[in-house]
A protein has these predicted regions:
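Phosphate-ester processing/binding pockets and catalytic centers
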Residues: 1-159
Length: 159
C-alpha cells in the first residue's frame, strides 16, 4: 500500500459512534467533528489544501467549513483553501475511501459475514500487517501518530 512507503502521505480518520454522541443531525455532527479534527490536528506552522469529498445532499457543507477554517483566521494562514471534489477525480481521496472502507468493515463486523469481499479482507490484512496490529476493529492511535491515525471521537452535543 503506497501510504506506508511514501513518507509524505498520511492518513487520518475519525470514528464517530452515533451511540456515543447526541447530535441533532448528521450535518451538525459533520461540522463539529471536522472542526475538532482541524483544531487539534493542524499544525499552524504548515500550510494545507483541504479536499472534501463532494456530497450532493449537503450543498452548504463546504462553504460553512471554509468560513470556519479560513475566514475566521483562527487557523492563521495555514489553510490555503477548502475544495469539494468528486472522489473519482482524485487519487488521494480514492485511497482515503479505501482505508475508510477497511476501517468501517472491520469496526462494523462486516468482514466476518459470509460473502464478504475477499479484496476488502486482503486490504484489511495488509493494513494490519503494516501497522503491526491484529485487527482494525478496535485500532486507535494517539493524535500524535503521524502515518496512519485513527481517532475515536467521543463528543458531546454542546461543544
Amino acid at each position: 500500500l503506497p501510504i506506508f512507503s511514501n513518507p509524505e502521505l498520511r492518513f487520518r480518520a475519525v470514528v464517530v459512534s452515533r451511540r456515543e454522541t447526541n447530535f441533532d443531525d448528521t450535518e451538525e455532527m459533520f461540522q463539529k467533528v471536522y472542526y475538532q479534527v482541524f483544531n487539534n490536528w493542524l499544525d499552524r506552522r504548515d500550510s494545507y489544501r483541504l479536499f472534501i469529498d463532494r456530497r450532493i445532499d449537503e450543498r452548504d457543507r463546504v462553504d460553512t467549513l471554509r468560513r470556519c477554517l479560513i475566514d475566521t483566521f483562527q487557523f492563521g494562514n495555514s489553510v490555503k483553501f477548502v475544495e469539494e471534489v468528486e472522489s473519482h477525480e482524485n487519487d488521494l481521496i480514492q485511497l482515503a475511501d479505501l482505508f475508510i472502507g477497511a476501517l468501517a468493515a472491520s469496526r462494523n463486523g462486516h468482514l466476518q459475514l459470509e460473502g464478504s469481499s475477499a479484496a476488502k479482507l486482503q486490504i484489511c490484512r495488509d493494513i494490519c500487517q503494516n501497522l503491526n496490529t491484529s485487527t482494525l476493529a478496535s485500532y486507535e492511535t494517539w493524535p500524535s501518530e503521524q502515518k496512519f491515525n485513527v481517532f475515536h471521537f467521543r463528543g458531546r452535543r454542546n461543544m
